[in-house]
Amino acid sequence: MRKVAIYGKGGIGKSTTTQNTVAGLAEAGKKVMVVGCDPKADSTRLLLGGLQQKTVLDTLREEGEEVELEDIIKEGYRNTRCTESGGPEPGVGCAGRGIITSVNLLEQLGAYDDEWELDYVFYDVLGDVVCGGFAMPIRDGKAEEIYIVCSGEMMAMYAANNICKGILKYADAGGVRLGGLICNSRKVDNEREMIEELARRLGTQMIHFVPRDNFVQRAEINRKTVIDFDPTHPQADEYRALAKKIDENKMFVIPKPLEIDELESLLIEFGIAN
């Protein structure tokens, strides 16, 4: 079972990219579990046809310790197994702590056991690695390979570099490695070349460039992944290609984060700052 975590700046399209990629893997016959690690609990909605599933933390709050696995895992598109960690009530408690509680409970209830014959587990993780809870998948060895969703926008690249610092910090203890950058295009000038160069400087690869297409939003409005909504659309092939590249990936590295002035010089070199 491969353990994958998807990180990236808030709003960059991690949940959308994760679910569309998982749909590509599921279509290819892989058995996948998706663990949403975001208080918004939107990491599995498209795989479940728009169903806002009850989160692990909500279930614990309402039912106490008497929780069964089927209470917190739902079957989605092509038998994907979907669960959402959820978060505390707004203004109370720590969302990162909630992820730790949820993942530990999933382990106790046997969600990762061999009987499920999982090929992959994907963790879709909120925003930047800013606190220990959100770093938990990489800190505790829950995830072994990380993919960072980014774009040619400065803050997305800044966040990607920060996440690489987190991976570097925990690489020895948790054994986690960076599998590559996924460029979720925002149609920035020279975007592909810039992210390829960022990847090169970090010591990794741009594993795929996902072109911007409003069809992704249309599929979302219909509560589906692109592959589920219209398997013949060119954008569906982009996610199939990304899924195939992840499935065949052999490049796993400890990244070399950039200094902030190196990052700024990259932006200047490729024309954003001009």
From Swiss-Prot:
UniProt GO BP: nitrogen fixation
Required cofactor(s): [4Fe-4S] cluster
Cofactor note: Binds 1 [4Fe-4S] cluster per dimer.
Entry's Gene Ontology molecular function annotations: 4 iron, 4 sulfur cluster binding; ATP binding; metal ion binding; nitrogenase activity
InterPro entries reported for this sequence: NifH/chlL_CS (IPR030655), NifH/frxC (IPR000392), Nitrogenase_Fe_NifH (IPR005977), P-loop_NTPase (IPR027417)
Reactions the enzyme catalyzes: N2 + 8 reduced [2Fe-2S]-[ferredoxin] + 16 ATP + 16 H2O = H2 + 8 oxidized [2Fe-2S]-[ferredoxin] + 2 NH4(+) + 16 ADP + 16 phosphate + 6 H(+)
Residue positions where ADP-ribosylarginine is found in the record: 97
CDD domains linked: NifH (cd02040)
Keyword line: 4Fe-4S, ADP-ribosylation, ATP-binding, Iron, Iron-sulfur, Metal-binding, Nitrogen fixation, Nucleotide-binding, Oxidoreductase
The enzyme's E.C. designation: 1.18.6.1
PROSITE patterns found in the cross-reference section: NIFH_FRXC_1 (PS00746), NIFH_FRXC_2 (PS00692), NIFH_FRXC_3 (PS51026)
Presence of the UniProt keyword Isomerase in the record: no
Binding of ATP, residues: 8-15
NCBIfam families xref list: nifH
Function per UniProt: The key enzymatic reactions in nitrogen fixation are catalyzed by the nitrogenase complex, which has 2 components: the iron protein and the molybdenum-iron protein.
Similarity field: Belongs to the NifH/BchL/ChlL family.
Subunit structure: Homodimer.
The protein's name: Nitrogenase iron protein
Gene: nifH
